Design a protein with these regions (language model features):
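CBM-like carbohydrate-recognition segments
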Residues: 35, 41-139
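Oxyanion-binding "anion nests"
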Residues: 1-27
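Anionic-ligand binding region
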Residues: 21, 31, 39
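A short beta-alpha structural unit
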Residues: 28-34
Length: 139
């Protein structure tokens, strides 16, 4: 019960920071940081799994689908995965995170992207009008 409650609280917190195009930023609460696919993929996977397992309200699937749409903007027609943040440890200054390089086709980003894509294969669909109305309530 504690784990599920914590999961729900984290999902509630994360969705507030999802960008208009579905992606999350390298620094979640800093819109001037770059949009990053690895974290987005992890959040899409977790939210979709949460809905499918009944841990999150079904309307949360809208957030996952919007994230997936955003992810597709960072995957080239050739299948290259872009906007992967270089490995990052805990650093003392925000400037370090702003200046992290973005990689292409790095396994640290490709793995979460593949997991998110597979999780979304059988994810529930949503009625867009209803979901858009509910999304504000979720946020």
């Amino acid at each position: 019960e504690d784990v599920i409650r914590n999961f729900r609280m984290q999902a509630d917190g994360l969705i507030r920071y999802q960008g208009a195009n579905g992606l999350w930023h390298q620094l979640l609460d800093k819109e001037d940081s770059y949009e990053e696919i690895t974290g987005t993929a992890m959040f899409v996977f977790g939210i979709a799994r949460g809905v499918k397992q009944g841990w999150l309200h079904p309307d949360y699937i809208y957030v996952a689908w919007e994230g997936l749409k955003g992810m597709f903007t960072k995957i080239t027609p050739e299948g290259d995965v872009t906007a992967i943040c270089a490995g990052t440890g805990i650093m003392p200054a925000l400037s370090f995170y702003y200046n992290r390089p973005q990689w292409k086709n790095d396994p640290m980003g490709e793995g979460p992207v593949l997991r998110a894509l597979v999780e979304m294969i059988d994810a529930p669909k949503y009625t867009e009008i209803k979901a858009e109305q509910q999304y504000d309530k979720i946020k």
